[in-house]
């Protein structure tokens, strides 16, 4: 189980080295990179209190669910869902009995990494041809290529998948395929297969707020595509700190109190 260890903020030198490495590896062409693209940069965390004038956002505060309605599952998907033993939510079991992959230090994957139950933040950086996301949870890094490339014809399945993006006005549209089937979509065990096709529409609706609409299309697990809506808030002055994964750490739940009293 992952335990959040509060450490000193990442040093400026480390960030500079990482950024330089990324810039050096950026490949041409960059013809679709818009120099005037909307600015998504900053440290973000899922919002705990959507604004009064916002439509209903469907991520549960405690259990880290992606949606508050059960999506239309296929028999295969229903079987996977019923076999899941989450340690949160109405179907929750003790951690020692859970088969949630993250309790064994597996990466949560996308989209679940956005909504991990302790509310850990992520940072967005934009460089020519790419949008980079640094997640505090287990220090995962996600690259979204915006240089006009298409998905590779030979993708090695992974936890984060293969992501390409384009700008539609003020919205970054991210298309991701190439997932493995070793993760859940959320903390309550919503399943997916290696056929998952995820589309995210990321939009900064104000200086302090950003929305992400997730379209889940997985014909093996669900009878039709479905959408979940999530709201994120800017955290000025926050830094991404060190997080390590410790297998079967029963003290994991205590990190919520740390976040409430500290960050």
Task: Tell what function each PLM region has.
Residues 4, 15-16:
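Classical secretory targeting signals
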